[in-house]
């Protein structure tokens, strides 16, 4: 019994880290033969997994060695350079704060970005409770054993899985023994040191792993230093049938990314110049996670975790302010251009926007896997449930100021009464799911899944109680309290079929549905009559609807030769009642959240990878067409086609910040067993800029004070 079960425990410890090669060994006439079977975990928790040919989607798998080979700064950096359908939007111009875009859906650290990807670390969802944002700086890259990028609206992965899910599994001392230290230096004062060490106790029952990372740079933009400090530690225990792991992730980061700049300022002062400063984010994290698994027998496995996660965020943003006059100091389109080292201070009015967010979350997840025949056919059934609770404290204030000669904002000690926010939020989320894969025969495999989600969101306004009626615009009176109780629920199904006529070809098709509930932040900033500043000067709002996504995917993968693999997939995802942040002001970041009807993402991913001796390569092409599928009117005063501060968006207009075409090529040569050299070549098409949702903006020429600046598009690059 023990000889049968012990390899399964070791496999469980490794399996969800990345798709691994599980060896089926058969002895015949004293000769051992092996067959490599690529196994992929299909749930957020570590589980028994499925062979790749049985999975009806174009899942992408990366192991820790591949991350190490490319010396990626963070996980977002690696994904952008290598994975099909992935691009980045570097709005903040900070290496640890990019938006990751996958098939037109986003995982971003920026509040206000419509989030559409779920991200998990060791089975725990790490999308932040306040806004579903993803802080990439809180995921230590040198602690990652592997990642799975699962496309589509797979309901098994729960809330926010509209366009895909990213599962990250961390290292342990059993699979990563020994130590390493790495130090690098670069331009703009960049310094990075990473260290790790892992091992196993003498009796083999306990393993341990610890890693740390320190990053510091001045930044390529003016006044843009960043310091990132990350710590990860894990201790594990196992016997013949069970395994436990307790891990801790900590971070203390201070990042400055001074954001976008107007084209005319860049032409005048250079690419390194900034608009205003600072744009500072301080993130701290304390994350405890206990994972366990137990085999009841050869066919039944229990996997579970429980966690506590505290994530704190402080921001300080220096902005121009068109709502404040201080003597002869005000704001207009030309004032920033006049602020330089040669000009006197006090030309532009400004504001220091401060926010503080404290997020405490805890919960658990559990699943049972049954690998037992059904009607004499191979079958794997997994049933599970999960609960997540979070408490949110959010505060925001604005201090009036003036922009100095370095484009920093000097505070005047005058606080805005209208911009003060003191919000308490509470969320409770329950989910139950089941997924079953039935092998109809050796070639056909049917997968059916479903999940029921129920989420409650409660906001409590500590400043404006219920019944705080104010005149929000001439003749319009509304209750401006943020307080409210909201609940959302839905059952989301999925079905898929894979066909493997030969060992070198798999064809598949699938349909799945997912949902995203509006977050505490979005529910508090949904009134076009009272637009908000992000992170949020929020106001009393009409309710938002949940977002429902529906995805079709068809594809194939296989081997051209023993050394060349290929894959191809076409997909179509429609979001119903999609949520978007609608900008209403060019200069102060004000806007509101709204359901904008249907949006659609459809496209194609093609991949090819191979090796010839010491030389290896891969190439990938992605096409994406992301469009609005509903006519709507958006409040927008910065678009040249605006009529009465609004624009008309028509069905078929392209979504902003999403490239139509992307090409990625990777080449690597193994000089010695321990030394390789390689290069990545990436090319992305141009995109429509935010604010040009109708794709019709045209920059006016001649008048430097004209409101309508910029082409409305951002150029592609290679």
Task: Please name every model-derived segment.
Residues 12, 20, 26, 198, ...:
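Conserved C-terminal beta-signal and adjacent last beta-strands/turns
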Residues 61, 92, 98-151:
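Periplasmic plug
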Residues 126-128, 137-180:
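A beta-strand signature from Gram-negative outer-membrane beta-barrel systems
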Residues 178-180, 185-216, 221-258, 278-297, ...:
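Transmembrane beta-barrel wall of Gram-negative outer-membrane proteins
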Residues 243-245, 283-466, 567-570, 608-611, ...:
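Face-selective signature of the C-terminal outer-membrane beta-barrel domain
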Residues 291-295, 301-319, 500, 506-512, ...:
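Membrane-embedded beta-barrel scaffold of Gram-negative outer-membrane proteins
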Residues 359, 378-388, 423-574, 622, ...:
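Structural signature of Gram-negative outer-membrane beta-barrels, strongest in the C-terminal barrel
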Residues 367-371, 442-443, 563-576, 592-693:
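Gram-negative outer-membrane beta-barrel transporters
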């Amino acid at each position: 019994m023990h000889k049968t079960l012990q390899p399964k425990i070791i496999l469980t410890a490794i399996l969800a880290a990345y798709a691994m090669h599980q060896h089926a060994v058969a002895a015949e006439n004293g000769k051992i033969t092996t067959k490599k079977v690529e196994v992929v975990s299909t749930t957020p928790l570590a589980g028994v997994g499925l062979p790749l040919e049985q999975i009806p989607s174009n899942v992408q798998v990366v192991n820790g060695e591949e991350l190490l080979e490319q010396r990626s700064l963070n996980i977002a950096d690696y994904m952008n350079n290598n994975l099909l359908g992935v691009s980045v939007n570097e709005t903040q111009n900070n290496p640890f704060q990019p938006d990751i875009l996958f098939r037109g859906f986003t995982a971003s650290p920026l509040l206000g970005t419509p989030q559409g990807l779920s991200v998990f670390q060791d089975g725990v969802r790490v999308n932040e409770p306040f806004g579903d944002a993803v802080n990439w700086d809180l995921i230590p890259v040198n602690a990652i054993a592997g990642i799975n990028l699962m496309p589509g609206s797979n309901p098994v992965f729960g809330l926010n899985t509209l366009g895909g899910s990213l599962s990250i599994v961390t290292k342990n001392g059993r699979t990563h023994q020994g130590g390493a230290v790495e130090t690098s230096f670069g331009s703009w004062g960049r310094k990075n040191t990473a260290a790790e060490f892992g091992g196993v106790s003498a009796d083999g029952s306990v393993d341990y792993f610890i890693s740390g990372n320190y990053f510091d740079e001045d930044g390529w933009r003016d006044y843009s230093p960043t310091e990132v400090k990350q710590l990860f530690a894990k201790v594990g225990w196992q016997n013949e049938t069970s395994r436990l792991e307790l891990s801790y992730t900590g971070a203390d980061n201070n990042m400055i990314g001074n954001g976008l700049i107007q084209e005319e300022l860049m032409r005048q002062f250079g690419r390194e110049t900034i608009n205003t400063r600072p744009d500072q984010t301080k993130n701290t994290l304390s994350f405890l996670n206990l994972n366990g698994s137990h085999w009841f027998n050869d066919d039944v496995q229990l996997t579970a975790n429980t966690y506590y996660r505290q994530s704190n965020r402080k921001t300080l943003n220096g902005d121009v302010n068109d709502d404040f006059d201080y003597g002869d100091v005000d704001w207009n389109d030309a004032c920033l251009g006049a602020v330089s080292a040669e000009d006197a201070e006090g030309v532009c009015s400004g504001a220091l926007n401060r926010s503080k967010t404290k997020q405490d979350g805890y919960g658990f997840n559990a699943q049972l896997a049954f690998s037992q025949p059904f009607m004499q056919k191979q079958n794997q059934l997994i049933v599970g449930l999960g609960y997540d609770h979070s408490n949110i404290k959010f505060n925001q204030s604005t201090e009036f100021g003036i922009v100095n000669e370095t484009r920093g904002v000097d505070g005047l000690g005058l606080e805005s009464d209208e911009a003060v926010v003191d919000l308490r939020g509470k969320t409770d989320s329950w989910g139950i799911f089941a997924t079953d894969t039935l092998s109809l025969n050796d070639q056909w495999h049917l997968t059916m899944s479903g999940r029921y989600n129920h989420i409650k969101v409660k906001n409590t306004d500590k400043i404006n109680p219920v019944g705080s009626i104010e005149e929000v615009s001439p003749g319009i009176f509304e209750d401006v309290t943020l307080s409210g109780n909201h609940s959302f629920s839905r059952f989301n199904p999925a079905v898929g079929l894979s066909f493997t006529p030969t060992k070198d070809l798999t064809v598949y098709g699938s349909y799945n549905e997912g949902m995203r509930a509006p977050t505490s932040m979005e529910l508090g900033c949904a009134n076009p009559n009272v637009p908000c500043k992000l992170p949020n000067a929020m106001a009393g709002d009409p309710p938002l609807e949940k977002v429902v996504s529906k995805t079709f995917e068809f594809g194939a993968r296989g081997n051209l030769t023993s050394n060349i693999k290929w894959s191809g997939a076409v997909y179509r995802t429609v979001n119903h009642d999609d949520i978007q942040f609608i900008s209403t002001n060019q200069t102060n970041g004000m806007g509101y959240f709204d359901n904008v009807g249907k949006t659609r993402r459809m496209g194609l991913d093609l991949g090819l990878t191979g090796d010839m001796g010491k030389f290896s390569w891969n190439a990938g092409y992605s096409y994406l067409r992301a469009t609005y599928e509903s006519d709507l009117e958006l409040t927008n005063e910065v678009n040249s086609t605006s009529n009465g501060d609004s624009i008309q968006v028509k069905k078929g207009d392209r979504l902003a910040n999403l490239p139509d075409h992307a090409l990625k090529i990777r080449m690597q040569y193994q000089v010695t067993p321990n030394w390789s050299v390689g290069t990545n070549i990436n090319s992305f098409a141009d995109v429509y800029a935010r604010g040009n949702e109708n794709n019709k903006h045209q920059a006016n020429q001649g008048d430097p004070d004209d409101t309508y600046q910029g082409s409305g598009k951002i150029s592609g690059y290679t």
